[in-house]
């Protein structure tokens, strides 16, 4: 393993106010997010359930890649003509403990939020896959307010529902949240 149980990977937003920590413990990868030293997302696990395959959830960290970007692009319409795309990125290279499959998780921290995505690199042990369920957890630190669209709604072009996160059911992404402190 490139990391042991006490190792943490840390990524900060460009202004340093948001911090992401990725931890490997007992072959489980989790992440947590703080903003201005206050917990926003408590340690939360990553993983998948695949069709006709063992669950993808027993990993070790094999490496990392870091990058940053600060660019401005022009959009044809919208509230702002020019949009700043400014972030720090951490790509975490994962491998199952049996060495069979690989998975990468790419985190991006912006000054006003975070994003993540999974990447299945090309590999001999997996020529195709069907994801039955994404098991990523979001253990929030409080009862935040959220704007969301029900997963059962077939359209994205609808009015978002506003409610406390403890009242959410299955939702579509993106999900927008705000703490009581306005963070």
What is the predicted function of each stretch?
Residues 1-8:
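Bacterial Sec-dependent signal peptides at the C-terminal "C-region" and cleavage site
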């Amino acid at each position: 393993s490139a990391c042991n149980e006490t190792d943490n990977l840390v990524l900060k937003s460009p202004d340093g106010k948001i911090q992401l920590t990725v931890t490997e413990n007992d072959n489980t990868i989790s992440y947590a997010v703080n903003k201005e030293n206050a917990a926003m997302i408590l340690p939360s696990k990553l993983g998948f359930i695949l069709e006709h395959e063992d669950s993808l959830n027993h990993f070790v960290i094999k490496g990392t890649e870091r990058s940053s970007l600060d660019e401005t692009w022009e959009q044809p319409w919208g509230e702002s003509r020019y949009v700043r795309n400014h972030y720090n990125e951490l790509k975490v290279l994962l491998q199952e403990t049996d060495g069979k499959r690989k998975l990468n998780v790419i985190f991006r921290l912006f000054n006003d939020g975070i994003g993540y995505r999974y990447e299945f690199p090309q590999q001999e042990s997996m020529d195709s896959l069907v994801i039955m369920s994404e098991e990523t957890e979001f253990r929030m630190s409080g009862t935040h307010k959220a704007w969301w669209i029900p997963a059962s709604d077939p359209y994205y072009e609808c009015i978002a529902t506003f409610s406390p996160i403890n009242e959410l059911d299955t939702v579509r992404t993106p999900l927008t949240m705000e703490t009581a402190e306005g963070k």
